[in-house]
From Swiss-Prot:
Alphabetical list of NCBIfam families matching this protein: PRK13815.1 (NF010388), rbfA (TIGR00082)
Gene Ontology CC terms, in alphabetical order: cytosol
Organism: Citrifermentans bemidjiense (strain ATCC BAA-1014 / DSM 16622 / JCM 12645 / Bem) (Geobacter bemidjiensis)
Domain of life: Bacteria
Main localization, broad class: cytoplasm
Protein family per UniProt: Belongs to the RbfA family.
Protein name in the entry: Ribosome-binding factor A
One annotated GO biological process: maturation of SSU-rRNA
One Pfam match: RBFA
Subunit-level organization: Monomer. Binds 30S ribosomal subunits, but not 50S ribosomal subunits or 70S ribosomes.
PANTHER family attached to this UniProt entry: RIBOSOME-BINDING FACTOR A, CHLOROPLASTIC-RELATED
Keywords associated with the record: Cytoplasm, Ribosome biogenesis
Amino acid sequence: MVKRSDKVGEQIHKIISELLIKGLKDPRIGFLTITGVKMTPDLRQATVYFTVHGSDEDKKNSEAGLNSAKGYIRKEIGQALKMRFVPEVLFKYDTSLDYGQHIESILKEIGATDDGEQS
């Protein structure tokens, strides 16, 4: 059984992704991807996870651009979803991809060490 919060999160993910393609013109927002949306059970808060392809400076600038567009994004969500309460939107950088790359590099190091020992 799918929870309502999951369905609403998927819809918000779709709306924000479309806004990034069509609606947001902030030059600080770089090439970013919305990786997920987590809703609170009462549907009052949506935490939007994103990744940025670029440097740490690009990450900071993109987060600042997203935070400055919160009001516009929330208004668009409200118009699209027709909910009694429009959830507050919080943006968080998704560190899971960075962590995955870190683990992958460690595994490659271990593999290179094992290959050296076997020779």
